Regions:
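Internal helix-turn-beta structural module
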Residues: 305-368
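N-terminal, positively charged regions that mediate nucleic acid binding
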Residues: 1-59
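Glycine-rich, mobile lid/loop segments that gate access to catalytic sites or pores
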Residues: 113-225
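The feature captures the hydrophobic core positions of alpha-helical coiled-coils
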Residues: 367, 371-374, 378-381, 385-388, ...
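Short acidic, glycine/tyrosine-flanked loop/strand segments centered on an H-E-D-like triad
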Residues: 99-125, 310-330
């Protein structure tokens, strides 16, 4: 299977299946000598792991990270960094009765069309279990970015038709992490929980919107045309199985505005930086960060695995009643939050390392230019020396002739 690697300068590859013995991630392009807080890495995995509340799947996976290469004495070595996570609570027997059924909303049919085979146990490679590895890689990326003053904050903006109030300028991480749906609005959080419980009781699921805000991203980060920062964010977030849409800044709301309203004028701040009045663009213009907060939102579909019966076809073409007996999330938004943060962090770190290479290349070019200038001066001096020596030889020869 191809396309298992993400990134350009900071790359990672994930492997493993939901019901296999292990899942893992290998990171390449990690600089040597960087400190990694293993406890913080585990904390990020704990935010995503199953069984953490009444609105998540009861599957009991500790998701303990095992760093098996590229790490020694608390620091990276510069070699590929590999992290393994053991699967400990698989119940493959739950999937036996549905092995030949084309599961609605799942990748079974499309994988069969592409590969001719599909691991039906928990969705195999297409399972959301793979996102634990993205969180592991993203946790490391977050630590590196924090050293540059970059902070990434994700939260559940809405569940079904319940929308959190985000009108205040400051979104509190403490408030977000204090409720099981990870909403920035405690009142809306309670309503979201009620909606999720109601859907679960009915054997159903609900979707929502997850928002990610990046603070401290330096202006100028990003590339034009085919490697735009916002394009890379959209690509990264759309690689998550449950995501059906991405918007940045005003996003789709901009389609209902006139240009005179959606355009965002600049002003010069007291510190001399140019800022935008409203940040309608969500921190990115022309594919390059403008120094404002980067604001991203993703549409999270209702989880496809539900216990409510659905009519669908099996591989023989017969219509059958389908329902899932396994353990599944009635709403995945709370667990998507750390995953979305991770993917945003990985895109940012990829661009930061690319920018560093460009800066290093530019510095190298400047040094080479200075060396070339010095070489030119040396060449001119050598020519002058030859002329001088030639003139001395001519004068000496003339003196000898005059003596004769």
């Amino acid at each position: 299977m191809s396309a298992n690697t993400f990134g350009t300068t900071f790359r990672f590859m994930t492997f493993g299946e939901s019901h296999g013995p292990y899942i893992g991630v290998v990171m390449d392009g990690v600089k040597p000598g960087l400190s990694i807080d293993v406890q913080e890495l585990q904390h990020e995995l704990n935010r995503r792991k199953p069984g953490q509340s009444s609105v998540t799947t009861p599957r009991n996976e500790p998701d303990e990270a095992q760093i098996v290469s590229g790490f020694y004495d608390g620091k990276t070595t510069g070699t590929p960094l590999c992290i393994l996570i053991k699967n400990q609570d698989q119940r493959s027997k739950d999937y036996g009765p549905i092995a030949d059924i084309l599961r609605p909303g799942h990748a079974s049919h499309t994988y069969i069309q592409k590969y001719g085979v599909f691991d039906f146990r928990g969705g195999g490679r297409a399972s959301g279990r793979e996102t634990a590895l993205r969180v592991a890689a993203g946790a490391i990326a977050k630590q590196f970015l924090r050293e540059r003053g970059v902070q990434i904050i994700g939260f559940t903006r809405s569940v079904a038709d319940v929308v959190a109030d985000t009108s205040t300028d400051a979104v509190s991480v403490d408030v977000i992490e204090s409720n099981i749906v990870r909403a920035p609005d405690p009142v809306a959080a309670e309503k979201m929980i009620e909606v999720i419980h109601a859907a679960s009781k009915d054997g159903d699921s609900v979707g929502g919107v997850v928002e990610v805000v990046v603070k401290g991203c330096p202006a100028g980060l990003g590339e034009p045309i085919y490697h735009k920062l916002d394009a890379d964010f959209a690509h990264a977030l759309m690689t998550l199985g449950a995501i059906k849409g991405v918007e940045i800044g005003n996003g789709f709301a901009a389609t209902r505005l006139r240009g005179s309203v959606n355009n965002d004028p600049y002003y010069k701040a007291e510190n001399g930086d140019f800022r935008t009045v409203k940040n309608d663009a969500g921190g990115i213009v022309g594919g390059i960060a403008n120094g404002e907060d980067i604001v991203l939102r993703i549409a999270v579909k209702p989880a496809s695995s539900i216990t409510k019966p659905t009519k669908t076809a099996n591989r023989a073409g017969e219509m059958v009643d389908f329902f899932v007996e396994g353990r599944h999330d009635p709403c995945i938004c709370p667990r998507v939050v750390p995953v979305a943060e991770a993917m945003v962090a990985l895109v940012l770190l990829d661009h930061v390392t690319l920018q560093d290479r460009i800066a290093s290349s530019s510095q190298a070019e400047q040094v080479e230019a200075k060396i070339a200038a010095v070489d030119k001066e040396i060449e001119l001096l050598q020519m002058q020396r030859k002329l001088y020596e030639g003139e001395r030889a001519r004068l000496a020869s003339a003196e000898k002739i005059s003596e004769v």
